Amino acid sequence: MYAVIRTGGKQYRVAPESILKVEKLEAEAGSTITFTDVLMVGGEGTLTVGAPLVAGATVTATVVAQDRLPKVIIFKKRRRQNSRRKNGHRQPVTVLRINAINAA
């Protein structure tokens, strides 16, 4: 069984026991999160597509860790101006383990 959920402005295809990195959620490691924005549920020859959400469907996940992605370097240079700027950014993410998909 699999589902498509929406969180952090993005859509993710999830399956039970899969590990997923999503945009930072305010939750501590070890806590359980329930996603109600389920866009699609499928598996074993059946497919339910929501319009826009599947009514009553939920996905539960456990927070594994709060992490950060590798650094992205931003470098801006203006030629012949002796002007340059270097900056770095590490995006915070939440690592989740999908526990169960409940289709209504």
From Swiss-Prot:
Alphabetic keyword roster = Ribonucleoprotein, Ribosomal protein, RNA-binding, rRNA-binding
MF terms from GO for this chain are: rRNA binding; structural constituent of ribosome
Q: Which Pfam families match?
A: Ribosomal_L21p (PF00829)
Q: Which InterPro entries match?
A: bL21-like, bL21-like_sf, Ribosomal_bL21
Q: Can you list the disulfide-bonded cysteine pairs?
A: none
> Can the keyword Ribonucleoprotein be found in this entry's annotation?
yes
What GO biological process terms are annotated to this protein in UniProt?
translation
Entry keyword NADP = no
Gene Ontology cellular-component annotations: cytoplasm; ribonucleoprotein complex; ribosome
What domain of life does the UniProt record list for this protein's source? Bacteria
| Family that this chain belongs to | Belongs to the bacterial ribosomal protein bL21 family.
NCBIfam families associated with the record: L21
Its biological purpose: This protein binds to 23S rRNA in the presence of protein L20.
- Record note on quaternary structure: Part of the 50S ribosomal subunit. Contacts protein L20.
Name this protein carries in UniProt: Large ribosomal subunit protein bL21
